[in-house]
Amino acid sequence: MGRRKLCAASAVGPDSDRVLMAANDWLSERRTEVAADRILDAAEELFTRHDPGSVGMNEIAKAAGCSRATLYRYYENREALRTAYVNRETYRLFDAIKEKISGITDPRERLGAGIATTLRLVRESPALSSWFATTQPPIGAELAEQSDVITALAAAFVNSLGADDPAVVENRGRWLVRVITSLLIFPGRDVADELAMVEEFVVPIVVPVEQRA
């Protein structure tokens, strides 16, 4: 009987405390992620209705239903919040693009379809397309150029077209980002016109003849 009591007591001893602390840490981290996402969701709604460059931290805090102090606890400034938003949407966009072009194996066709799908998905999103409005400063292009996440995912896409030297892959990925942002700011006459330009001027650089063969 005494042994049973001892075992029962040990069940809520140091090991159990560590388990509870780990669980609490996980819950705390999860709550932080949820709160951060809610703030970005509120910012997204504002980006949909207003020029992203005019949206400040005061407006975002009000839309998110939190104080400025709380907002700054998650994002130290507007640039950090913008970067977090762009990175989140880039991951989502990349996953959607991969799914839509998953059945295309030819590198040339895959590249054209990937660019066309990217342009279409961004343009269909009021929040994302607002970053590339010609009536506003090119904030979207600037963020795309500065984002390590966008650069890395673009390089990963280029790498999926065929193995190559890592430095070459990175350079082609950066070039691809510039091409896409340029088309978002200065679109072609229509989808066919843009695809024709991609096939003539982008494919030969990103997917050389020897690589396609």
State where each predicted segment sits.
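Basic, helix-initiating cap at the start of DNA-binding domains
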Residues: 2-50, 54-63, 80-83
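Amphipathic alpha-helical packing segments from all-alpha helical-bundle domains
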Residues: 91-94, 137-174
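Amphipathic alpha-helical segments used for helix-helix packing
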Residues: 113, 117-148
